[in-house]
Amino acid sequence: LGTLAENILEEASGKSLTAGEIVYANVDTAMSHENAALVIRWFKEIGRERVWNNERIVIIFDHRVPAESIKTAEGQKKIRNFVKEQGIKYFYDINTGICHQVLAEKGFSRPGIVLVGTDSHTTTAGAFGAFATGIGATEMAGVWATGKIWFKVPETIKINVEGELNKGIYAKDVILNIIGHLGADGANYMAVEFDGEAIKKMSIASRMVLSNLSMEMGAKVAFVYPDEKTRKWLEEREAKPYKFVLPDKNARYVDEYNFNASEMQPVVACPHSVDNVKSIEEVEGVEIQQAFIGSCTNGRLEDLREAARILKGRKVRKSTRLIIGPASWEVYRDAMREGLLDIFIEAGGVIINPGCGPCLGAHQGILASGETAISTTNRNFQGRMGSPESFVYLASPATVAASAIEGKIADPRKYLR
């Protein structure tokens, strides 16, 4: 009667399991970004000469690319040297994209595997049916050395989303509605399984939004069941071997929640927490100085298409800066071929190279004190995108695009008629 989390961990450990047990699992893929520099330090302290498997470690530069400080440059150099010395096969330098997007594009995110990453939003790969979760640098050093990791088998909650998404409502609105309902710790150390008509109809890109943001309600892992769409994506990506793992018919869930997508409105997460969710009507008219469309949450092609639909033939308000950051160079080039980048430039937007910069307040558009931003990213904690005296609202790409035009938070639906 296993849940999806239990079934995958059983496969990875060779034991039969139930929630609450401690298990040692074999890791399929271990991903790090620039914080690999820290992992290297701990790995050397363990005293191992070689990593357990140089074809199962993936390193992707994305947080501060190209390097914005001497400290970052030194860290990146240290990692490049380690990659060379260990013969790590899958190393993606500053010209690839954001780690969670790259894992998907290169066929690493796939059903039935255990995937760990030194980034909290590693849960994104759950959209493909992977047991994917974030771990710390010391923990990752242990994985690099042994290829194994211990977990407490999480309990599972099931979230059913039925109905149809109306015009102007996107996966981002769905998950923010859910987080607003469950709260920031509503799924603490739990596995989440998403099901229902609305989820089945979603594209892979939209499903990634759900799994990505589930971290913001405390989820350990967040699954969308793999299906034909998943299979098609993986075939196109020449993915590594995988098998579809699903929950058993009568799996035990600690809780089940039901939502109706047809009743959902565009929503915005207000400062300074992701569960401070309000309907667009409640926050319409709040002045903004910056609008950001991009990140591992909403920087994919479908997101940029929606933003371009709204921005086409219109101008960003003079008092507002619009920054666009595609999630990867693959997305960037697709957007370029489709003429989307032209639309953004024509509207007065600034396009940055793929990376995490603005989302974590590292570079490429940091907020000053007293400034307000609306962003498609996944966190709005105090000081997240710059000054501790700045304010961040989170919304869908359509809502952010509409707000950039007006210089204040705006309902995207009036631009989609």
Where are these regions (language model features)?
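Fe-S-dependent hydro-lyases/dehydratases of central metabolism
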Residues: 1-417
